[in-house]
Regions:
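Surface segments flanking catalytic/ligand-binding clefts of nucleic-acid enzymes
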Residues: 150-340
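Short gly/ser-rich loop at a beta-strand->alpha-helix junction or flexible surface loop bordering the NTP-binding
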Residues: 1-178, 317, 327-340
């Protein structure tokens, strides 16, 4: 439902509730069969109308549950302020922050991290993703080559609806191990990413060794580098914008997708930009989909980044390659991609 709202509006237009109203909604929520009208659910994006799926409803106590075919229940007696939004009169949804916590508790912390990264980025997936309700969409596939996954898995350009700081503040008042574990991962979230593959790349290079990442963060995304006179003369540009800039390493990490980079004009622009950055003493590495699936190559790139930071690359995690591959495939699943 949240993805459907972002696709249709470009943002979330739902109404915030004050804490008293949130408690009242949770306390009095007790839906019956008569309250669940499929056309309305399809209209607001809570159901597709084409795929048989369970509807998950939140109530404040076990006594509020009802035996309804096709409905599963989640029970929570209390939620922090800012957990519930009003979709329309009588219909409510978890906020982006609360949804991330729910996914962390019910599915896993990395899956919740991936969802949080999507919500912090300028993308919204179609609902073919594994961890939110399915939704059939004819959107053109923008993720990779057509052979890599079905053509109806794609993404939409929208505005972010969450920030890492907002999520961290919310998690600070949440109870439970899942919330605390997700809170520890908030510093590794990035903002304003523009494609699912950028999200996967930044997660791999930012997350700690213990999760299967390369511990190269933090990165500044959409970072504007002003060129000096020499760099301007060489590149013909006043500045460059880096996808992911590691300031301590003076290192720019770029994802080179199929769109916008394969044309002659795109190649010339990238060459000028990269030459200008190199003139400024900034090393540039370009990663594509094939390279991102090669953990040995990515670890060599991470080693170079650590070297530029004047640090030793010390990944002493047992079976580290298996952890790295498991992290990659978990992230790919979250963004609707096949495992490698």
């Amino acid at each position: 439902m949240m993805r459907a709202e972002r696709r249709q509006m470009g943002y979330i237009s739902w109404k915030d509730l004050d804490p008293d109203e949130e408690r009242r909604v949770l306390r009095t929520s007790s839906p019956s069969t008569e309250d669940i009208y499929l056309p309305d659910l399809v209209r607001i994006g809570a159901a597709s109308g084409e795929v048989q799926e369970d509807l998950c409803l939140l109530v404040g106590s076990a006594a509020q549950r009802r035996r309804i075919l096709g409905v599963s229940w989640s029970v929570c007696s209390g939620l922090p302020a800012g957990s519930i939004l009003e979709v329309e009169p009588g219909v409510y949804s978890l906020s982006p922050e609360a949804l991330c916590v729910a996914v962390a508790r019910e599915v896993g912390c990395i899956q919740a991290f991936a969802l949080a990264q999507e919500l912090c980025s300028k993308i919204s997936l179609s609902d073919r993703g594994k961890y939110l309700p399915p939704y059939t969409s004819p959107v053109t596939n923008k993720l990779a080559k057509d052979k890599d996954q079905p053509a109806d898995v794609g993404y939409f350009e929208v505005e972010p609806v969450l920030t890492p700081d907002r999520l961290a503040d919310y998690l600070a008042v949440c109870k439970g191990n899942a919330a605390k574990q997700l809170q520890r991962l908030c510093p590794y979230l990035s903002e304003n990413l523009r494609s699912p593959m950028e999200c996967i790349m930044l997660a791999l290079f930012s997350l700690p060794f213990s999760y299967g990442g390369f511990a190269c963060g933090p990165f500044k995304t959409d970072c504007k580098i002003e060129f000096d006179d020499r760099a301007q003369a060489i590149s013909g540009m006043p500045h460059a914008v880096c996808d992911a800039y590691q300031e301590a390493a003076r290192f720019d990490l770029e994802y080179n997708g199929e769109l916008g980079h394969s044309s002659r004009r795109g190649r010339i622009h990238d060459e000028k930009r990269n030459t200008g950055l190199i003139t400024m003493g900034i090393e540039v590495a370009t990663v594509n989909n094939e390279m991102l699936c090669d953990m040995e190559a990515m670890e060599a790139l991470a080693w170079r980044m650590h070297q530029r930071m004047r640090k030793r690359y010390r990944n002493r995690v047992d079976a580290r390659r298996k952890k790295q591959e498991a992290l990659l495939n978990t992230l790919r699943a979250c963004f609707g991609l096949k495992p490698v």
